[in-house]
Amino acid sequence: ETVMLITGPYDAFAHLETLYLGVLARRTRVGTNTRRVVEAAHPKQVMFFPARHDHWLVQTGDGYAAHIAGAIGVSTDAQASWWGSEGIGTVPHALIAAYGGDTVRATAKFIEHSAADIQVVTLVDFENDCVKTSLEVARAFGPRLYGVRLDTSEMLVDKSVLSQQGRFRPTGVNPQLVRNVRRALDAEGFQQVRIVVSGGFNVDKI
């Protein structure tokens, strides 16, 4: 299938060939890979958070490619600029570290300085005990908390999974960890709190 047709004297655009082929190659790769992830995750939604893993100058075009491919949001304003939107995100590990590892306090400060319409999603793996931290932030913020994000390192096993190890890979974010957090939240009446997962995800892992 033809992606682009250029008509005219070759010497008028020959010098641009490397430029436009490079743009097409990168953006179609981002778009194709994002689409595969979106389809694998369906009906769950996918957010595109690549900004920390590549050069900052590629954010705008990559974000647009991911948007076209079906990602519901991107992590920076630059990535969202071509369609007039804004970046989305979560309370980061660095902010939690700045408050001595106190996720509840860091989340409170994030809320204090955020607009009321911001959907608050906070990381809950700082202490490697996602169940405990998820419950702490849910109890502290109730309906103001939109979701918790599990981002456990691929080199670590979450505390809630230690006693359940057996016939599955226990490291990082895995289905058992997600189930543990979901059950704990539901048991205390926090069914409305969503769970966001990240870290090492690809089509096969999904």
Model-derived features: where do they sit?
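Buried, small/hydrophobic-residue-enriched core segments of structured protein domains
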Residues: 4-188, 203-205
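Extended C-terminal subregions enriched in glycine
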Residues: 193-204
